[in-house]
Amino acid sequence: MTPNIHHDKILILDFGAQYTQLIARRIREIGVYCEVWPWDHSPEEILSFGAKGIILSGGPESTTSPGAPAAPQHVFDSDLPIFGICYGMQTMAVHLGGATEAADKREFGHASVQVIYPDTLFSGLSDHPSEFRLDVWMSHGDHVSRVPPCFTITAATDRIPIAAMSREDKRWYGVQFHPEVTHTLQGQALLRRFVVDICGCQTLWTSANIIEDQIARVRERVGCDEVILGLSGGVDSSVVAALLHKAIGSQLTCVFVDTGMLRWGEGDQVMAMFAEHMGVNVVRINAASRYFDALQGVYDPEAKRKIIGNLFIQIFEEEASKRKQAKWLAQGTIYPDVIESAGSKTGKAHVIKSHHNVGGLPEQMTLGMVEPLRELFKDEVRRLGVALGLPHAMVYRHPFPGPGLGVRILGEVKPEYAELLAKADSIFIDELHQADLYDKVSQAFAVFLPVKSVGVVGDARAYEWVIALRAVETVDFMTAHWAPLPYDFLSTVSNRIINELRGVSRVVYDISGKPPATIEWE
């Protein structure tokens, strides 16, 4: 019998911190299901969610500012264990009768915390046992200056007298540091202590259980109907294909839409892997001309994303109309897409880019939705793929945007631009593999710049296109550093692109971090 993997769960109320999704990923790694909701979500839904504990995340606001997000009263009325992290601890303190103040100096980076009182959260945890100290990561400007009534100060640093607090009878805890980041050495142990020991959650959230659960859910949802899936060869759609093929077999039809904006040779690779190797029913549709016609004269990135998303659905509905049993459209939507598209009722959350799987779906879509990865983070999707038997090279492929090269060609998208870019990108990726650098960077790709640059080809003056190379290192894709690739490697890539591709005279390397830049150029 499949265990109820959602029975024991944690709710994270998001106050806008860059690390909030990381908290959720760490809890999932422990083996417990959790969700991230905006801090101002409706009280009725929060209380009916059935969480065994609530975490208040960090956030960029100051509790001393008028209108700052505040911990909701109904959370404290719930009798559930509560864990406030950074801003979450501060808003907990203020709401319950304590106080906060701005620190003389902001504290960012490594810090050493002295445990004063080893409550249930801290008991037995230490990086320096003889001193009962923890090495942690701080990122705050304000701090708690007075704990609420009945609370105990449990930890301090040389700079702040209240680095942690608790009220054991209520099972309320707060820490000023960030246990979710790897720099806090006992961070995962602290989260486990709260989730498993204090909240009493069982660790049922495993790849094997998720696969069993999703197979049962898919079978119950679709019955004998046919399901169609857009198969691109990316990680998400590949894992969905493998999972659905295992769940419903011949009821699954994968539709590979060649948009003309995919990676070089991707169509043949997709057909070889799924149709020939796995025995999945795959229909290949050449829709490149339709996409390029629809994108003609369109320069705005958001407009391009919407057009690509809407045309994607239109093509699928056309294919479904040929299949009388096709009632469902499967998609590779993953949990970060859902979180970032939800937003906050207060308007404090801002949409940076719409998501191909979430933001571009037309309201009149006639197919039902099947999204078996909707609850999963990317690292969970990869582990699921391995458990399903997919090749490592496919599962650990770098991310590729839903709109494809359409958002890596700046401005208007043309067929000749897409062909040049796909070839340049293929050269870059090939050289990364040859130099054993591919797995050392988190994401790498080429970008087509719609500007021409003067060059010399042979003895003649040339006026040709510019290709930008982008490679980043990141843990969570919320922040990223540009990858310091060796100069001789970049020289090799540049020479190959310029020599092998007619129409390119210059190659540049993007050395922008995130923030301020995003990883993708559009």
From Swiss-Prot:
List, alphabetically, the Gene3D superfamilies matched.
3.30.300.10, 3.40.50.880, HUPs
Q: Which part of the chain is the Glutamine amidotransferase type-1 domain? A: 9-204
The record's listing under InterPro entries reads: Class_I_gatase-like, GATASE, GMP_synth_C, GMP_synth_GATase, GMP_synthase, GMPS_ATP_PPase_dom, NAD/GMP_synthase, Rossmann-like_a/b/a_fold
Enzyme Commission (EC) number: 6.3.5.2
The active-site annotation reads: C86 (nucleophile), H178, E180
Q: Which Pfam families match?
A: GATase, GMP_synt_C, NAD_synthase
Recite the UniProt keywords alphabetically.
Answer: ATP-binding, Glutamine amidotransferase, GMP biosynthesis, Ligase, Nucleotide-binding, Purine biosynthesis
Top enzyme class: ligase
Pathway listed for it is: Purine metabolism; GMP biosynthesis; GMP from XMP (L-Gln route): step 1/1
Keyword ATP-binding listed? The answer is: yes
Which GO MF terms does the UniProt record name?
ATP binding; GMP synthase activity
Which CDD domains does the record cross-reference, listed alphabetically? GATase1_GMP_Synthase, GMP_synthase_C
Q: Which cysteine pairs make disulfide bonds? A: none
Q: Which residues form the GMPS ATP-PPase domain?
A: 205-397
Binding residue positions for ATP:
S232, G233, G234, V235, D236, S237, S238
- Write down the chemical reaction(s) this protein catalyses: XMP + L-glutamine + ATP + H2O = GMP + L-glutamate + AMP + diphosphate + 2 H(+)
Source domain of life is Bacteria
SUPFAM superfamilies, A to Z: Adenine nucleotide alpha hydrolases-like (SSF52402), Class I glutamine amidotransferase-like (SSF52317), GMP synthetase C-terminal dimerisation domain (SSF54810)
Q: Name one GO cellular component term.
A: cytosol
Complex formation:
Homodimer.
Job description of the protein: Catalyzes the synthesis of GMP from XMP.
Q: What is this protein called?
A: GMP synthase [glutamine-hydrolyzing]
